[in-house]
């Protein structure tokens, strides 16, 4: 089949460049445990960047977080990447993988790949000393999803 999605390795630099070009509301990340890409006919159509959980309370050594997932809109690329991320994390010995989406998003690709919605998470904005002067991301509640 000519237009089949394929999993391909990708460097953090390449994944971040894809995020810079295509992500609706996030910027590239500074580090990762691994990144993967989805390709069709050798052309990258989506990337996922997986790292340690942003929340230090969830950073237990057994949990990773999909920090960025971004596609060009290719059908089924999101669920393909979420499934691939879980297979990779599980094969590395991790017990849980988490991610967050905006509350306005429906999570269909996560549900299609076996993830469960845990509920609302976080606040609308950053708080504390690290809060940027200008909001870097949409001021909305997030939904937390996980798979184990």
Feature-to-residue mapping (PLM):
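Short glycine-/small-residue motifs
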Residues: 46-47
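Charged phosphate-binding loop/patch that engages nucleotide di/tri-phosphates or the phosphate backbone
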Residues: 140-148
């Amino acid at each position: 089949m000519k237009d089949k999605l394929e999993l391909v390795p990708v460097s953090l630099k390449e994944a971040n460049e894809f995020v810079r070009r295509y992500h609706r509301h996030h910027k590239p990340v500074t580090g990762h445990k691994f990144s993967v890409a989805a390709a069709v006919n050798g052309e990258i159509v989506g990337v996922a960047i997986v790292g340690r959980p942003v929340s230090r309370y969830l950073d237990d050594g057994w949990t990773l977080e999909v920090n960025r997932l971004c596609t060009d809109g290719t059908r089924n690329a999101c669920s393909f990447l979420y499934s691939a991320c879980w297979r990779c994390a599980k094969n590395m010995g991790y017990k849980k993988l988490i991610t967050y989406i905006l509350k306005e998003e429906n999570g269909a690709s996560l549900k299609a790949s076996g993830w469960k919605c845990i509920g609302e998470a976080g606040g609308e904005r950053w708080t504390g000393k690290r809060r940027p002067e200008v909001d870097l991301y949409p001021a909305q509640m997030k939904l937390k999803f996980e798979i184990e």
